[in-house]
Design a protein with these regions (language model features):
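Tubulin/FtsZ superfamily GTPase core signature
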Residues: 1-219
């Protein structure tokens, strides 16, 4: 609330309780979300139950909770990196504010692709992560950032952007960035922040092919 009153861009990245924690705890969380929405520009919600899609039955409990913390960290870092990491096509804070100010629910996704179709695979992973509560379907605005090595091509950048536009299923307005990272070899990383969802937005299950490997998806 203080940050909002100071005119700061306020973004919340939060989790919802596991179902096994009980209805009362979930009800408290939902009330908290409703109150939080009054004081922020944008919110990204990650249901803890979807964590099971990223771990197996042998994963220790403490490691599972560490994975939740890691997802939250990556979400925050993905926003800060868009602003702070210099790019071939730069994004700045004004771009992030344009997409995220007074926008309500948001999607933040990161995907990594390898090989011949690496850019397409990375883009599909970014919009189809099992941890995201909101599908990109119905988004009206998005930031798309593509990071690759010195061999990143114009065609790959175009392919990644087209996957995201088609997945949104709307005439989506996009702000685009591209980064050349000489430390990357075969991989391409795609980051997408999407906002502007209407009340009829679809929940996860929409979008493109969900059968892509999940072990290389950051979020």
């Amino acid at each position: 609330e203080i940050a909002q009153n100071l005119g700061c861009l306020t973004v919340a990245i939060v989790t919802k309780p596991f179902k096994f924690e009980g209805k009362k705890r979930m009800d408290y969380a939902l009330v908290g979300l409703d109150e939080l929405r009054k004081h922020i520009d944008t919110i990204v919600i990650i249901p803890n139950d979807r964590l099971r899609d990223l771990i197996d039955r042998s994963t220790p409990l403490n490691a599972a909770f560490q994975e939740v913390d890691n997802v939250l960290r990556i979400g925050v870092q993905s926003i800060s990196d868009l602003i702070s990491v210099p790019g071939l096509v730069n994004l700045d804070f004004a771009d992030v504010r344009t997409i995220m100010e007074h926008r309500g629910d948001a999607l933040i996704g990161i995907g990594v692709g390898f090989g011949e179709n690496r850019a397409v695979e990375a883009a599909k992973q970014a919009v189809n992560s099992p941890l995201l509560e909101t599908s990109i379907v119905g988004a009206t605005d998005a930031i798309i950032n593509v990071t690759g090595g010195t061999n990143l091509t114009l065609f790959e950048v175009e392919e990644a952007a087209e996957v995201i536009r088609q997945s949104a299923n709307t005439d989506i307005n996009t702000i685009f960035g591209a980064v050349i990272n000489e430390n990357l070899n075969d991989e391409v990383i795609v980051t997408v922040i999407a906002t502007g969802f209407d009340d009829a937005r679809e929940q996860i299950g929409g979008g493109l092919d969900n059968s892509l490997p999940q072990n290389t998806s950051y979020m």
